[in-house]
Amino acid sequence: MMTAGTLPAQWQAAFQRDRQSAPVSGADPLPERRAARLLAAFILSGLAYLALPGTFLGVWNLIEIAAHRTAAGASSAWIQAHGHAQVFGWVGSFILGISLFILPKVRGAPLRSLWLGWLTWALWTAGVGWRWGCGVGLHGWRVGLPASAILELAALGLSQFLLFFPSSRRPRRRPKDLGSLLGIAGFGGLAAALIVNAMAAFRTAAANAIPQYPARLDRMTVELALWGFMLPLAWGYSTRFVTIFAGLRPPRQRAATGLGAGVMALIALLLAGQFALADGLAAILVGVAAWALRIFEPSAKPAKRLGVYRHFPAFIRLAYGWLAAGAALELAANFQPALGGAARHALTVGFVATLIFAIGPRILPAFLSSRELFSARLMAASLWLLAVGCLARVASEAAAYSGAAGWAWKVLPASAFLELAAVLLFVANLALTLAQPPPAWFRPETMGGETPLYWYISSYPRTRRLLIASGVKTLARTRDVPRSLTLAEAAAAEGLDADVLVGHLRTFFRQRQPRRARA
């Protein structure tokens, strides 16, 4: 590596300008790219938990249940491990990653520490994976269950430190909007769920012969994760993403305090074990949330459909329809317990999964270095397969577990395979989206020699190799690049023609044009 004194004169002068706080045209793209990389890690680990420990294990469990024609046909420990991977491994990873990426931007302050963000990802991913492994028979589960619970709590603590204590010293305003209050309540619900999960883990490790949580603590953990964490945060993020991309009218902000307080009351009821009262309150909150978000009201603007499946707003409304159905089934399950499984599936797959399948392909590629969704057709196929599979699953599970229809046991496995196909298409679509290089959302002709060299290599790291091959040898000998050094100055430092470098870069960016621009 070169020292400052051995750098070309143009580089030394640019570093001197930087030290004197000379202005640099354009925002610094490097922090954005690094934050997107952290988000990509959360998304990829979430997709892995969705496809393998989550859905695949769930299909296996359902096949066992259908074969024995009883809900007790599959291992309860395996079912609990599957549920944990789905709720915390998939949805939890998505929510934590998106929160660490988007909330600092909303506040206008960068993430306090990217390193702590990566530590959060490592602790969370390891904790969820260890918990799943213990449930399916991993050796040493008596140590693994409590240890995994501690890792998950540590990850949550780190994430909240990063989110609620930003690096900016500017005075913070008290959050009053609907999205913020629901987010605060939702993370409170996650904390409650993880604390109960830790209690169950320690009790199971100390007293049980198998890695199976006591039924009451397991139900409390799941209900807290669902009603206290996933649903409030889904509503909170709907105020931003669903409203904008589906073209809805602005949310009714006057519902913020009541809905936030209602979620906290619901969490308190669940912690007290008052499940029937909690179900009644949950049904009321569902109605209030749908009213506040204006989900079923006519859109005020055209939906933003470019690059995605054009009917995705209909599936967002379908998701909220499933939410209402799930809340009704939860209430009914207090009188007919056999409906409990169908109710939970309507909420987790019907609402949560459908909402993510509908809005995720619209927002995640944009967050991940402004990529394009790989395929709108794969998005459409995953949504339709999920919709049909979920309908078949909820109907057949309610009928089969109630003992009302023998045919339902044959439909159950088929519904599972439909949902598995939907999940695999969704995972493949997002994975292929991530595998694509970020496109250049500008005309190559607009780039020239006066653009900072730092912008090129920070926004599109592969241009570093291109520029080195084109003769900018200093880039090969130093890692740091002065932010005010223009491409023309870098060319002069090497005795190169700046127009030749610009031509090479324009060829590079022509090959990176978005598909819709090339069509």
Where do the protein language model's features map onto the residues?
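Initiator methionine at the very start of the polypeptide chain
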Residues: 1-2, 519
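Hydrophobic alpha-helical transmembrane segments of multi-pass integral membrane proteins
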Residues: 2-443
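Compact, charge-rich alpha-helical regulatory domains located at protein termini
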Residues: 442-518
